[in-house]
């Protein structure tokens, strides 16, 4: 039995002259083509995903300085993962396998429930849908 790629299952969708591949790991957009031409830089499904390529940036999409923030009167400290800037960067959804919710010829939907992680104790579920039509990706 062959091993799964490092990035998990590969979900292929297409519509007309468009095609895309979305990975189970992080619900990342690995490939997007129009008329067979790459529109993004594709990455190898058996290698670590290059930084930020096709990532779903969740539960927060940017840097949190010193990994610290306050919410509803409470202070939180998230892990620092961008050491040169002392920031917590781009959330962590890209590090986890997402659950397949729906796969059709022209669209795929994946879902992920955030674990209780240091500094982000909120119970959230994120759903990502990639859909192709004659106009491209939505």
Give, region by region, the residue ranges found by the protein language model.
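Surface-exposed acidic/polar loop and edge beta-strand patches at domain peripheries
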Residues: 1-137
């Amino acid at each position: 039995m062959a091993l799964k790629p490092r990035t998990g299952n590969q979900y292929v969708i297409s519509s007309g002259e468009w095609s895309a591949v979305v990975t189970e790991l992080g619900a990342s957009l690995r490939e997007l083509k129009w008329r067979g031409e790459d529109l993004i830089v594709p990455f190898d499904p058996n290698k670590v995903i290059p930084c930020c390529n096709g990532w779903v940036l969740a539960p927060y999409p940017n840097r949190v300085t010193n990994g610290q923030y306050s919410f509803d009167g409470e202070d939180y400290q998230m892990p620092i993962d961008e050491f040169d800037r002392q920031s917590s960067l781009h959330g962590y959804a890209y590090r986890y396998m997402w659950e397949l919710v729906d796969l059709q010829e022209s669209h795929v939907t994946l879902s992920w429930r955030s674990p209780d992680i240091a500094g982000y104790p909120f119970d959230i579920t994120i759903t990502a849908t990639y859909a192709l039509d004659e106009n491209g990706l939505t």
